[in-house]
Every structure is written in C-alpha cells, then in structure tokens.
Amino acid sequence: MCIRDSCIKMSWITNYDAAQRELLMQKVQMQMSERRFRHVLGVEETAVALAAKYGADEAKASIAALTHDYAKERPNDEFELIIRRDGFDLALLNYGNEIWHGLVGADIVQRELAIDDEEILQAIRVHTTGAAKMSLLDKIIYVADYIEPGRDFPGVKEAREIALVDLDAAVAYETKHTLLHLIEQEHKIYPKTLETYNQWVVNQK
C-alpha cells in the first residue's frame, strides 16, 4: 500500500530535486511534532554535508535523513502489531520505541512513502543501534543523528570535530559514549548495539 501521490517509487532517487524534497518534507512534517521536525532538518543538513565531504550520494543522504524518524511518534501498539504481523523477531517486543522506530520504522517508510531503495531503508534501520557492517550512508545517518546542530550534551562538540576528519572514528566515539550513557542509566541494551561497539570501538584499536 502507498499513499496516492507518494507512489513515486524510485523517482524519489532518480528525480530528486527541490520540488521532490519539498513534497517529502511535507509528508514527514505531518507525522511529527514541530520539535521533532526541527531535529530532522538538522540531521538532513548534517548528513548532506557529510555526504559531500566523504563522497556519498547527497540525494540519498537527504532522503534517509528526512525519513529516519518518520515513525518515531507512532504509538507502541502500532509497532507491536507490525512486529507480530510482519515476521519480525519477537524478541524486539522486549525493547521499545528507541529501537522500534528505526528497525520497524523503515518498513513503515517503505510502505507509506514508497521508498524502495534498500540503501536508504538500511540507513533508517540502523540509525540508532548501528551495526557491525555499515555502509557509508549508514555511518553518515548514524553520526548525523548524533551531532546535528540541535544536539546539546557533553561531548557533542568533540564528536562534531571528529566527524569532520574521520567518519569511522566518529562512529566509534558515538557508539562508545552512547553505550556508557545506557549503562549509567541502567537501560536495556539491544544486542546490535553491542555488536556495533565490538566492531567499531574494540576492533578498530
């Protein structure tokens, strides 16, 4: 299923211009609070800049960034229904929106916005947890979400500086500090986050 005028499929990529971006922004904005939308625009600004610096596809960076939190404000019962209905690992039910809005949210983006580009969808899936294997676009969205201009927390300035010179080091920095925060707050840690840590922090030494 797709929403009438969003059944554009791959033209999001092949014909992505200012008009297409505006249409996509409108669809995204309708799904979230103004505060969340400002964050999304900050992630897009950062992702496109990183894509330009590291030689990634800037259109894909824009689309992935604009849609990465598309499902963030959906109710938990909608996620639970999709997890049960669509064959996701039921262990996901032990977690919450912080995990679901990426891993499950990518399927919502695909269904409702007719975005079928697997590279974009994968970047949405792993933008919170990371992964042991990450494409250039995966890393860009993962880091951009962490360092966008609206973020304000101890260490974000250093993270931004690292991202300008070494994207892999920025992935490692983010992963390490996110894991430390989760441990300090005694939050449940999703296994893929540990896989990300082992690959990008431990194995990069």
Regions found by a protein language model. Name each.
Residues M1-I3:
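Short, small-residue-biased leader/transition segments that mark boundaries at the very start
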Residues L180-K205:
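Charged phosphate-binding loop/patch that engages nucleotide di/tri-phosphates or the phosphate backbone
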Residues Q26-M30, V48, K53-T175:
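Divalent metal-dependent catalytic cores for phosphoryl transfer on phosphate-bearing substrates
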Residues E34-R38:
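A short, charge-rich alpha-helical start-of-domain segment used by transcription regulators
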Residues M10-W12, Y16-M32:
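Generic N-terminal amphipathic, Lys/Arg-enriched alpha-helix
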Residues S33, A52, T129, L180-H187:
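Generic secondary-structure signature for well-ordered alpha-helical cores
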